[in-house]
Amino acid sequence: MISCAEQRSRQGEAGRGPAPVAPAFLPLWLPRGCSGILSVPAVAMHSAGTPRAESPMSRQEKDAELDRRIVALRKKNQALLRRYQEIQEDRRQAEQGGMAVTTPALLQPDGLTVTISQVPGEKRVVSRNWARGTCGPRVTNEMLEDEDAEDHGGTFCLGELVELAVTMENKAEGKRIVSEKPTRARNQGIEGSPGGRVTRSPPTQVAISSDSARKGSWEPWSRPVGEPPEAGWDYAQWKQEREQIDLARLARHRDAQGDWRRPWDLDKAKSTLQDCSQLRGEGPARAGSRRGPRSHQKLQPPPLLPDGKGRGGQASRPSVAPATGSKARGKERLTGRARRWDMKEDKEELEGQEGSQSTRETPSEEEQAQKQSGMEQGRLGSAPAASPALASPEGPKGESVASTASSVPCSPQEPDLAPLDLSLGGAGIPGPRESGCVLGLRPGAQESPVSWPEGSKQQPLGWSNHQAELEVQTCPEPQRGAGLPEPGEDRSGKSGAQQGLAPRSRPTRGGSQRSRGTAGVRRRTGRPGPAGRC
């Protein structure tokens, strides 16, 4: 059950809330224990109203807050005023010192860039001040005179009052470049409009140097390549001015002794501008000479010595041929291995021609050898004494070997055939009487219808590649029997061998070399040389 005290406390809490407009008595539903209606006067509900003493205190606090804000704003304004005064004082001092750049205010040029090449350890002070006004030649000259008197940089005019003066602490050299996009004539000045407004001249490109040696000097106006010539523009004067600028630039890169300042310029040749112009003129001609047809640049093989070797004693190799253009025709299109093979065939043809010339010389040499053998035969007939038999490598078989060698030269059925060591100065051989032996040169496989393959066992032992094979011809007397071949048969066999050689135009490399070697021996000695032994 809820006691009456609790009911009263609840009524008191309800009375502290907002005072609604209600009757004097409020009906309350009570639980089962309490019955009846409690009457609460409305005045008790309004007992806790807002205090009136707090309103004057809040007004005083608000006034104090406003006062603090006013003081803060005054301090800020004073600080801004002092800062503004300091700036104005600094600007006034800069203008008095001649370090100011004054240009029209509210009319800043389009695309004006100021580039200063700063040297480490130096300070530059550059200040700009834009101001309305025009700049005439007289004003510009006065500015230049003032700047020279004060030992400062150059001043220039772009149709308006534009001053550029950069001061350094140590008054050293320095280059200042002020460039704009050139669009119209550079000499066009400022014209006043009918309304009295001031119009700007078109932007131009200016390069000014403040070197101590050239103070107040104006570098010429530069015009980009491709621009149409302007009115009143003299090319000769412009060219001369550009050359002077180039010479001055080269002079800046050299010291007092004339040497280059930078280490990477030491390898430059001391060329003048005339040399540069000559090189420019020769450039297109030199390029045109390089574009000539490559077909005229044919590779010539190196000259060969008679022994088939190049310089240095080694077998000459054809150098690698450079690749030619695709417009070449015929053999000139060959590159690499194909060109080397073509040169190899040309070399073999040349050797074949030399071998054929040597074979043409052999018949006349054989005739001379036969004459000499006839003379020796007369001497041997008058001699009373018989000389010992000639020594052959195979004993008594040498005579049969000689006869078979003359009848069937280089037959593959006789692997043991060996040449005879014969000399024309020796005496005759007892037994089958023979007056002498004639040594006929055979250039290997070139004259023989049946040749031995190189490297086979049928090649005679003890023979080197550069030695020629010898053909032994016997010259019998009329009393000799029919067992030995007649000289006519030998000549017919040799002529048949030469006829068999005629259709072949390209001999093997080894045979041609042997033929050349033996031909050289016959030319030097005048008679057949003895067969070599290993």
UniProtKB/Swiss-Prot annotation:
Q: Specify the domain of life of the species encoding this protein.
A: Eukaryota
Composition bias of kind Basic and acidic residues appears in 173-183, 329-347
Q: Which sequence positions carry the modification called Phosphoserine?
A: S201, S392
* Pfam families associated with the record: DUF4594 (PF15266)
Glycoprotein as a keyword of this entry, yes or no, is no
* Keyword annotations of the record: Coiled coil, Phosphoprotein
Polar residues composition-biased segments: 201-211, 401-410, 456-467
Q: List the coiled-coil residues.
A: 60-97
**GO molecular function, one example?**
RNA binding
Q: Where is the composition biased (Low complexity)?
A: 382-393
Write out the ranges of the annotated region (Disordered): 173-237, 274-534
Enumerate the transmembrane spans. Answer: none
> PANTHER family per the record?
COILED-COIL DOMAIN CONTAINING PROTEIN 9, COILED-COIL DOMAIN-CONTAINING PROTEIN 9B
Q: What's the name of the protein?
A: Coiled-coil domain-containing protein 9B
